């Protein structure tokens, strides 16, 4: 790496979009953005929308949004560790929107160029519900774009919204 060149997997910002299949009639569409500034602090914002095709026709949907204030507390040339605290919201077509809190822990590893492996875990509450999400993904950085695949275990109390997903991330 030459002086001044950005190592893309650990660039100061990124945005991603992904599509996941929960089951034969439920899909997940998600987007995330992360930006980090001075002193390793950052913001991590995400939207997860689940859409279910109903047996009688039509669709039902729910949406989760989260915003974390993060700190990259450890790093080397090929690995980063982040943690954060934040806010989470839940919206559906039935009742009022609900909000709560969440905790995030994430690791990004670049074992060999161009591959990146990521793990993240977050847990929190919205109303009386406990929401947890665990993700594993692997991608390959090509210039400033990273196509990736992964698996996500998403829980809302006892409800499982697990999915396998495909996505793309853009570094800036």
Please tell me what each predicted stretch does.
Residues 28-34, 66-68, 102-106, 135, ...:
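Membrane-embedded beta-strand positions in outer-membrane beta-barrel channels/transporters
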Residues 47-67, 81-96, 123-172:
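Outer-membrane beta-barrel translocator/channel fold
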Residues 39-45, 76-81, 109, 113-119, ...:
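Repeated loop/turn-to-beta-strand initiation elements of outer-membrane beta-barrel proteins
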